[in-house]
Design a protein with these regions (language model features):
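An acidic, glycine-/histidine-flanked metal-binding catalytic module
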Residues: 158-235, 382, 389-393, 408-409
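Intrinsic, low-complexity N-terminal interaction/targeting segments
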Residues: 3-18
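Short beta-strand/turn micro-motifs at beta-sheet edges
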Residues: 12-16, 238-243, 311-312
Length: 409
């Protein structure tokens, strides 16, 4: 592998990003799942070649921090050797699918959800004509069941609706029927073609649909809109997730601030062996789902997870506050986001807050009720928006921001 080139946005396994704590790389497990052996491989490689910190991203990828220059190549080799990445860097970069978390486990989900997601990912990866897709362009395959993929911010959503698969570009109110991966590839190609003709080229599908309308995009893709598609809500991804007759299910474990140590990942793998089916399913909500858990064993699993510092209770107050890594790991950050987020937790605010180190908003895809945006060592407040939106108030210390939030709207 040639020497790394610094990136400022969306790292991958073969295109690391320089951060304040070393190089940052992403691992995209095939099918969105880790076997116990693969989890141990990632944990071991993160400890050996990085600083042992692993994050779970909003696209259900793993992000490993703190790699030294000399560790980038060996880390990538370990991940490829474990079957967790395509050895071709260009194909790996085009693997852009958020997989249905409980495919093959939840009987209420579409039976072919995992197969279709894999086919779509292979088709995107195998099409060199899609090399110019923006780094954040993502497809979500939602097979229904207990863990739907609502609120992922994906550019194309492929969903199981009333007994058939529909594909909808973000911002559209309807979808085209999907028989195989071809419809999704057509939408991706149409995005490139149509956005390339715009004076100010949109970087996301929602912006393009907002500019030209979904009918024009479907026409460019040579697809027919056949049915309405209602956006699905973000599911409850933490705690006991029953399926079938309720005697078995999955258990969702959240990561505080989406971060864990290599030792914690190994601990989750041990839990999956002891109580589940041995697989760790990644979700886009900074949580992992462990399928194959007996309902009677769920309390023991939750207790073990709590001892590891994981979020096992849907009412855990740590779920309400999210934060990017901030100055501790990002040179672009203007504030120590996670330390300040911990201060918010101690105050027990009854509102969901995202703390962003800067206006890029890497740590939060969707809008939040409140976003605190770092600016020159202080904070701006964005309500019902994203970090890149204009703050209604600027120049606040964290204490001042907390005071305003405690005072109410």
């Amino acid at each position: 592998m040639s020497g790394p080139a610094a990136k400022g946005w969306c790292p991958s396994l073969f295109a690391p990003m320089r951060a304040a704590d070393g190089w940052l790389v992403r691992v995209k497990p095939p099918g969105g799942a880790l076997s116990v052996a693969c989890a141990k491989c990632v944990a071991g490689a993160a400890e050996r070649f990085g600083n042992g910190t692993i994050e779970l991203t909003s696209r259900a990828n793993l992000q490993v921090r703190g790699l030294a220059d000399e560790g980038i190549g060996p880390f990538a080799a370990a991940i490829v050797g474990a079957g967790l990445a395509d050895p071709d860097p260009e194909r790996e970069a085009r693997r852009r699918v958020i997989h249905p978390p409980l495919a093959g486990a939840d009987p209420a989900a579409a039976r072919d959800a995992g197969r279709l997601a894999a086919e779509i990912e292979a088709a995107l990866a195998g099409d060199p004509g899609l090399a110019d897709l923006p780094a954040k362009f993502t497809v979500a395959v939602d097979g229904g069941g207990g863990l739907t993929l609502g609120g992922t911010g994906a550019d194309v959503v492929v969903a199981w609706v009333d007994g058939r698969w529909l594909a909808a570009p973000a911002g559209a109110d309807g979808g085209a029927e999907v028989a195989d991966a071809e419809a999704v590839v057509r939408l991706a190609r149409a995005f490139l073609e149509v956005s390339g003709r715009c004076a100010a080229r949109p970087r996301r599908m929602r912006a393009l649909v907002g500019a030209i309308g979904s009918a024009a995009l479907f026409a460019a893709a040579e697809l027919d809109r056949v049915a309405e598609m209602e956006p699905r809500a973000k599911p409850q991804a933490i705690g006991w997730l029953a399926y079938g007759d309720g005697r078995r299910g999955a258990f969702g474990l959240g990561l505080p601030f989406g971060t864990m140590s290599a030792a914690t990942l190994a601990g989750i793998a041990a839990i999956a062996v002891e109580w589940g089916d041995g697989s760790l399913r990644l979700t886009p909500w900074r949580a992992m789902a462990l399928p194959g858990v007996e309902a009677a064993e769920a309390p023991a699993l939750a207790a073990k997870a709590a001892r590891l510092g994981l979020i096992a209770d849907p009412s855990d107050p740590r779920r309400a506050v999210t934060a990017c890594i901030g100055r501790a790991g990002c040179a672009a950050a203007a504030v120590d986001a996670r330390a300040d987020a911990a201060m918010l937790l101690r105050r027990g605010l009854k509102i969901a807050v995202h703390v962003s180190g800067c206006s890029k908003g890497c740590g939060q895809v969707e809008a939040a009720p409140v976003t605190l945006v770092g600016e020159d060592g202080r904070y701006g407040i964005v309500r019902d928006g994203r970090a890149g939106d204009a703050p209604s108030v600027r120049g606040l210390t964290m204490a001042e921001a907390i005071g305003l939030l405690e005072a109410g709207p």
